[in-house]
Design a protein with these regions (language model features):
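Short, well-ordered loop/turn sites that connect or cap secondary structure elements
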Residues: 34, 43-44, 63
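Ferredoxin-like alpha/beta domains used as RNA- or RNAP-binding modules
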Residues: 1-31, 55-83
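Beta-rich strand-turn-strand
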Residues: 36-38
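Short, structured beta-strand/loop micro-motifs enriched in basic residues and often containing a Trp
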Residues: 47-54
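Residues that recognize and position ribonucleotide moieties
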Residues: 20, 42, 49
Length: 83
């Protein structure tokens, strides 16, 4: 018997930043994904956060315009006024 796994549809959301970059842990708090810095750290260290399609375990990773942060079936595209 074969079991078919349904793929969870991914959501896409643009997130506008007004600075040159935002740290990954600060981004998770900014979007309300993590309630505290400790929770953001846990999400990142547990490997459930991807940056541009690759697992990122560096909580101080600088996220720039054009980057995509993925967590919990949502892809957040970082944008600025310039793009």
């Amino acid at each position: 018997m074969k079991i078919k796994e349904k793929a969870t549809p991914r959501k896409n959301e643009n997130v506008k930043i007004t600075t040159e970059f935002i740290r990954l842990d600060a981004f998770l708090k900014f979007k309300g994904i993590a309630e505290t810095g400790g929770q953001a750290k846990t999400f990142i260290q547990d490997g459930i956060v991807k940056v541009n399609g690759e697992v990122c375990t560096a909580r101080g990773k600088k996220i720039h315009a054009g980057d995509t942060v993925s967590i919990f079936s949502v892809d957040y595209k970082i944008i600025t006024d310039e793009n």
